[in-house]
Amino acid sequence: KAGVFTTGALGVTGNKKLSFYAVAWKGKSAKLYVRVDNGGSVSPVSVDLRGDDGATGNPPFKTIAWSDETDYFTLELSDLTASSTLTFSTSSTFTAASDSSTGRAVVCGVQIY
């Protein structure tokens, strides 16, 4: 099943950077899509994630081997408004429906600066 998460209003305006760590589920790959709503845009709109043996159905995910080289992403946010929100999904349609072509992901360390 594809996952979808939407933040609250960001409360910042203008152009910013969005950085985070993300991996796909053990033995899988995934594409993580990011969308800006309520004003603004993001580039790129998706990133490819590698599978990590620590990303399983058994949290906490203490055994994920995070890598700055393969798992850390920085995207450009443009023209944000104070009410802009971010939506993260493993579905290009941003729906939480069963879809065998999408993968699961673990996202952490999200920063806007």
Go through each PLM region and give its residues:
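Terminal, low-complexity interaction segments
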Residues: 27, 42-113
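Short, surface-exposed linear patches
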Residues: 18, 40-43
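Extracellular hydrophilic low-complexity repeat tracts enriched in serine/threonine
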Residues: 2, 6, 13, 38-41, ...
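Short, exposed beta-strand/loop patches in secreted or surface proteins that constitute
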Residues: 10, 34-36, 77-79
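Short beta-strands within extracellular/lumenal beta-sheet-rich domains
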Residues: 1-17, 28-30, 70-73, 107
